[in-house]
């Protein structure tokens, strides 16, 4: 966050400053527990909780001011629409920094967060980098990330998600990216969009939102993504296994823990890369990150060096040894059919004893939800010795898995069952949509 006085913030967002004059020097937060000294607490009045009631707690944590819809115990900028004010403030801050800043937007049906993490690791070696924390990729998370940018920031990496057409266009209206990375068009949020064509149109909004002359970085393996090249007059870089992708993935080999080594090849050079991440799909994510880095001026050799030590956000393909001698693969943050298949492929590639897939409901799949769950269940049964379906909503997974399935009522029952049945050498995958909270199962085993 660049230093801004309370009155200046009020002027930027069209609000009224109340309380003593203070200067905000630290990032904005929505959670009072995450406030930092000198920070701005953004208070929303929701149906079940009113953020304004937590202003004092935010102050104790170090926040010096509040952006809200009514005065609080802290100096406050009062506005009619807090969301719009937050977005306006973020757009203003980035506009002031824009001359020295390269903005990268990342979207796709799956792999956004992992690719964003890889790209941030690469760009951090080339200059001060601010990137989305976790999956804060919506109309609130993106401006919060933008407000973390400072005068010294050289790269701003923004994960951009969507549940409806127009969502990403709204985000690029706040900050037009210099580089737009589109990973894939899958079935995540199909229930909200209604069709893959609608999902493709939504993801394409990132390309359409590029600054004039900005670079689109597109997956050559996904025809829906590759066709987005017509949405821009600027340069296009491609990545993938397809020949001739601009950054091509070749010779993928997995070690005993399912971690890929591969060659990334461009027209000018190539580099061998060993990723410290689980899953063959990480090689494709790495090629996307390398292509985006090339667009940002980072050469392939520096990108691959950085990728060898990259790490992912929590609860994403985390490998951990358990006290019982089993191995936990925690990918519990979120799930859709495509990402679950990738995780199951990773599970099957890890050497060990039995492979146990603990799966929960995949949300927002619309009318095809039951069929998608059955199909993933069958896919799991071909790659795991036991498929544990957690919760009644996950029963179609068990139906698809057939005789390999175990159905358990909830997370506590899953923890109890696993504690009773896990043995040394077993490998257990935990994965579901965020709403299923299967991170509780992973935590219960750790």
From Swiss-Prot:
Coiled coil: none
Reaction(s) catalysed (UniProt annotation): D-alanyl-D-alanine + UDP-N-acetyl-alpha-D-muramoyl-L-alanyl-gamma-D-glutamyl-meso-2,6-diaminopimelate + ATP = UDP-N-acetyl-alpha-D-muramoyl-L-alanyl-gamma-D-glutamyl-meso-2,6-diaminopimeloyl-D-alanyl-D-alanine + ADP + phosphate + H(+)
Record GO biological process: cell division; cell wall organization; peptidoglycan biosynthetic process; regulation of cell shape
Keyword ATP-binding carried by entry: yes
An MF annotation (GO) of this entry: UDP-N-acetylmuramoylalanyl-D-glutamyl-2,6-diaminopimelate-D-alanyl-D-alanine ligase activity
Pfam families with a match to the protein in the record: Mur_ligase, Mur_ligase_C, Mur_ligase_M
Pathway stated in the Swiss-Prot or TrEMBL entry: Cell wall biogenesis; peptidoglycan biosynthesis
InterPro entries with a match to the protein in the record: Mur-like_cat_sf, Mur_ligase_C, Mur_ligase_C_dom_sf, Mur_ligase_cen, Mur_ligase_N, MurCDEF_CellWall_CoF430Synth, MurE/MurF_N, UDP-N-AcMur_synth
Entry binding sites for ATP: 108-114
EC number: 6.3.2.10
Keywords: ATP-binding, Cell cycle, Cell division, Cell shape, Cell wall biogenesis/degradation, Cytoplasm, Ligase, Nucleotide-binding, Peptidoglycan synthesis
Localization of this protein: Cytoplasm
GO cellular component terms attached to this protein's record: cytoplasm
Superkingdom: Bacteria
Family: Belongs to the MurCDEF family. MurF subfamily.
PANTHER family linked to this entry: UDP-N-ACETYLMURAMOYL-TRIPEPTIDE--D-ALANYL-D-ALANINE LIGASE (PTHR43024:SF1)
Function: Involved in cell wall formation. Catalyzes the final step in the synthesis of UDP-N-acetylmuramoyl-pentapeptide, the precursor of murein.
Name of protein: UDP-N-acetylmuramoyl-tripeptide--D-alanyl-D-alanine ligase
Organism: Streptomyces toyocaensis
Gene name as annotated: murF
